[in-house]
Regions:
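Short hydrophobic/aromatic patches at helix-to-coil boundaries
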Residues: 100-104
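Mid-chain, well-packed structural core segment of small domains
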Residues: 51-78
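Amphipathic, interaction-prone secondary-structure segments
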Residues: 38-52
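N-terminal intrinsically disordered, cationic/polar leader segments
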Residues: 2-34, 38, 73-76, 84-99
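A generic short-segment signal for beta-strand/edge and adjacent turn/coil regions
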Residues: 18-21, 47, 67
Length: 104
């Protein structure tokens, strides 16, 4: 099974788990907020906004277009730190750890 085949179901699950955890947003951030150059757009977006509006669309596009996937990254530590006082987000964190494992 290719990395893309392993990653696709995880990316499809992410919006569902985010909705169940109350993290999914209906309204997109502004173009200005989305154009941040900072890692995780920390200066303009909440962690869940970056996940929904930046990470997820980019990763889906890479998989759908059969482009090379990034490797050697780990996003879960950022979210673990950001949400350390939010145990209700544990299902999302678990999924992010799985995504990290596929992309190593």
């Amino acid at each position: 099974m290719t990395k893309a085949q392993q990653l696709l179901p995880l990316l499809q699950q992410l919006p569902l788990v985010m909705r169940e955890s109350g993290l999914w947003q209906q309204d997109a951030p502004s173009t200005e907020e989305l154009s941040s150059n900072e890692p995780f757009s920390v200066d303009t977006l909440k962690p869940e906004q970056w996940l929904q509006w930046v990470f997820l669309p980019k990763m889906r596009a890479l998989v759908e277009q059969k482009m090379p996937l990034p490797t050697g990254f780990s996003i879960s530590p950022y979210f673990e730190e950001s949400w350390k006082s939010c145990p209700e987000y544990a299902p999302v964190l678990s999924l992010l750890v799985s995504i990290d494992e596929v992309c190593r």
